[in-house]
């Protein structure tokens, strides 16, 4: 888990918050299951935040499941969503959160994402210092061929990666 102070710094002045937990790995790791979602909700409300909606995705790292989990989050006028999963799950939530800021509650160490049955794509190295809350849900450590954290390298052209011009610059 991230230190609560770090999470609260990301949440900042947001008042209306949604929380998404993960029924799979994060539940098994006690970092984002129903118990932890309830604990975070209670903490946020004690800090004067309004937790408008919570949900549990079977797997936060599966886009199709996350889409269904986030349906109740739509039209709630949320200021942000907190993803209580691995960094990969937070990225899936961010892709489906209707452009709301999504903040990670955990510092993930490693993982990949199921693109389709039997095909996996590395999307998070669980580096232990998750920056997805600052990068719009894009992990520069895994999605940049050079793992740059300070912006594009000098070799990118027209928003394309220097190492593999087929890929967009992270």
Predicted regions and their residues:
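Iron-sulfur-associated redox domains of electron-transfer enzymes in respiratory
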Residues: 1-156, 162-165
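Short secondary-structure subsegments characteristic of cysteine-rich extracellular domains
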Residues: 168-170
């Amino acid at each position: 888990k991230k230190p609560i102070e770090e999470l609260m710094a990301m949440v900042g002045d947001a008042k209306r918050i949604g929380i998404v937990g993960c029924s799979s790995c994060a539940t098994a790791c006690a970092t984002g299951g129903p118990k932890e979602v309830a604990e975070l909700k209670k903490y946020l409300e004690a800090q004067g935040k309004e937790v408008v909606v919570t949900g549990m995705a079977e797997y936060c790292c599966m886009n199709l499941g996350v889409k269904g989990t986030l349906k109740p989050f739509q039209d709630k006028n949320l200021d942000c969503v907190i993803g209580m999963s691995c960094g990969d799950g937070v990225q899936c939530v961010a892709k489906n959160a209707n452009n709301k800021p999504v903040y990670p509650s955990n510092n993930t160490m490693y993982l990949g994402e199921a693109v389709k049955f039997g095909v996996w794509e590395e999307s998070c190295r669980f580096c232990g210092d998750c920056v997805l809350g600052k990068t719009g849900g894009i992990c520069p450590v895994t999605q940049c061929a050079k793992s740059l954290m300070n912006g594009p390298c000098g070799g990118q052209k027209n928003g394309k990666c220097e190492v593999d011009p087929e890929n967009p610059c992270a």
